[in-house]
Amino acid sequence: MPVATRQRSARAAGTAFSPLRWIGFLLGCIVAGVVAMQVYFFLQIAAWQYVAPSSTSFMRAERWRLCGFNVWNCSIDRRWVPYDQISRNLKRAVIASEDADFVNHPGYEIDAMLDAWERNKKRGRVVRGGSTITQQLAKNLFLSSEQHYLRKGQELAITWMLEFWLDKQRIFEIYLNSVEWGEGVFGAEAAAQHYFRTNAGKLGVGQAARLAAALPAPKCFDKKEYCANVRVNFRVKAGIIARRMGAATLPD
């Protein structure tokens, strides 16, 4: 083989297996994967204007935790009901408890996020998220329960998508039908049946306030033997929520 040909072949081989080219290729694959994931989220949320989500990422994780491979004899309790069949008392209680400015903000509150950032910086890790109802829904629909800044960034992106495609009433309807309210209990109808043996549309003020008070720690609320010292706080919080319900603005 002529010397010039051998040199060209060596240069071509060196170029083909250059570490920089491999790094560039891997980075390109990562970027393409991230973009594809965002497109999937975007189109999935667009479809939810017309159809209800059959489940959420958090529901599937909880079902696996509770049931494992025993899917035939084990399940979670979740029963979808339309927005107008959910008690206005529960809607007001959840707004009063979780996100008083829900109908006005664009899905997130800058002041709450900055406050959470300062608290997290002092602790050296993500311990508080400053989450609105839309942010909570974004996390439950698609994300894990891990606490780190990359996940928080993805949560904000999904929050924007939810607010882009869905009006506030639809966001709230999906939230009320998807949020965890106890061990394997998801959504307003399942919670109303589980705790009070009634329909979600018939919840009274006190019942609604108690359910709203449970949202930050629903498993503790449900399994009182594990959280007996916390239930007093639930009762106190329920009383506070009941007094604030009259000022809650609903997305009707």
Curated annotation (Swiss-Prot):
It is a single-pass membrane protein. One of its GO terms (cellular component) is peptidoglycan-based cell wall. It is found in: Cell inner membrane. GO terms for molecular function: pentosyltransferase activity; peptidoglycan glycosyltransferase activity. It is an enzyme of class 2 (transferase). GO terms for biological process: cell wall organization; peptidoglycan biosynthetic process; regulation of cell shape. Its EC number is 2.4.99.28. The keyword Flavoprotein does not apply. It catalyses: [GlcNAc-(1->4)-Mur2Ac(oyl-L-Ala-gamma-D-Glu-L-Lys-D-Ala-D-Ala)](n)-di-trans,octa-cis-undecaprenyl diphosphate + beta-D-GlcNAc-(1->4)-Mur2Ac(oyl-L-Ala-gamma-D-Glu-L-Lys-D-Ala-D-Ala)-di-trans,octa-cis-undecaprenyl diphosphate = [GlcNAc-(1->4)-Mur2Ac(oyl-L-Ala-gamma-D-Glu-L-Lys-D-Ala-D-Ala)](n+1)-di-trans,octa-cis-undecaprenyl diphosphate + di-trans,octa-cis-undecaprenyl diphosphate + H(+). Gene3D superfamilies: Biosynthetic peptidoglycan transglycosylase-like. Keywords: Cell inner membrane, Cell membrane, Cell shape, Cell wall biogenesis/degradation, Glycosyltransferase, Membrane, Peptidoglycan synthesis, Transferase, Transmembrane, Transmembrane helix. Signal peptide: none annotated. Peptidoglycan polymerase that catalyzes glycan chain elongation from lipid-linked precursors. Belongs to the glycosyltransferase 51 family. HAMAP family: PGT_MtgA (MF_00766). This is Biosynthetic peptidoglycan transglycosylase. The gene is mtgA.
